UniProtKB/Swiss-Prot annotation:
It holds the Pfam family Ribosomal_L33. Belongs to the bacterial ribosomal protein bL33 family. Residues 1-28 are annotated as: Disordered. It comes from the Bacteria. This is Large ribosomal subunit protein bL33. The gene is rpmG. GO terms for cellular component: cytosolic large ribosomal subunit.
Length: 51
């Protein structure tokens, strides 16, 4: 089953992306570099739960 997750910027800007992932195939927390438009740079985004 694919669960919805939130990818939060590690730059501390509060910007986030929403996506989904298959928890059976990727049980670990996701980390990926994505563009943060607030600081206009590519920064690490980490997985967080959607409340």
């Amino acid at each position: 089953m694919r669960d919805k997750i939130k990818m939060v910027s590690s730059a501390g800007t509060g910007h986030f992306y929403t996506t989904d992932k298959n928890k059976r195939n990727t049980p670990d927390k996701l980390e990926m570099k994505k563009f943060d438009p607030v600081v206009r740079k590519h920064v690490m985004y980490k997985e967080a739960k959607i409340k």
